[in-house]
Amino acid sequence: MSQSGSALRRNGFTFKQFFVAHDRCAMKVGTDGILLGAWAPVADVKRILDIGTGSGLLALMLAQRTDDNVPIDAVELDAGAAMQAQENVAHSPWPHRITVHTDDIQRWAPRQTVRFDLIISNPPYYEPGVECATPQREQARYTATLDHQTLLAIAADCITEDGFFCVVLPEQIGNAFTQQALNMGWHLRLRTDVAENEARLPHRVLLAFSPQAGECFSDRLVIRGSDQHYSESYTALTQAFYLFM
């Protein structure tokens, strides 16, 4: 079943347990976010931080995957996107667990008195260059407002000693991000290289870093099989969310 088959309403994306409206968000629901939300390790997680929540997709996916006593803080700089995320949360099964903060993570993070077991982000990754159609889309796509070194430093200040910081990035940018993280004292613990099919090279990488050293587990995920249907591994990862799986 194709991903587009789940988009039953034109202004958003329908999942099995919730709906994500995204017509007022610069970055729409896409495969990158769905992969990250389904992949991030959640065992024994007690508190979650979503940096740059956008429509609230990752916060909602993680709410579905975790116990009902796990609070989730979702921070979004763009006021329009944050309002839409708040509406998506309010209409979901977990309005009591997810708090959307309309704020700059660089201002919000230093004020926090608790640390997070899981920090997740689908971060911007383009260097400033060609102008986007709107300032909101430029903010979502380019690193000018939140470069990767700053993001890594903020996550380091907010994470528990044995927590995980998870991101999804294009393959080459992910390699550079990994080296930057290692230089800053992070340890790479999980890596999944994502390819569209067996014949193609990976185009995305899912990364999980921790302040704590340990073995790094690496694997490869192929989205589609030779018949162009979703692969067994992709189906197993995402079937709790996609409506027609």
UniProtKB/Swiss-Prot annotation:
Catalytic activity: adenosine(37) in tRNA1(Val) + S-adenosyl-L-methionine = N(6)-methyladenosine(37) in tRNA1(Val) + S-adenosyl-L-homocysteine + H(+)
SUPFAM superfamilies: S-adenosyl-L-methionine-dependent methyltransferases
Known EC number: 2.1.1.223
Localization annotation: Cytoplasm
Pfam families the record matches: MTS
GO terms for cellular component: cytoplasm
Disulfide linkage: none
Main location: cytoplasm
PROSITE patterns for this protein: N6_MTASE
Described function: Specifically methylates the adenine in position 37 of tRNA(1)(Val) (anticodon cmo5UAC).
Family stated for the protein in its record: Belongs to the methyltransferase superfamily. tRNA (adenine-N(6)-)-methyltransferase family.
Protein name: tRNA1(Val) (adenine(37)-N6)-methyltransferase
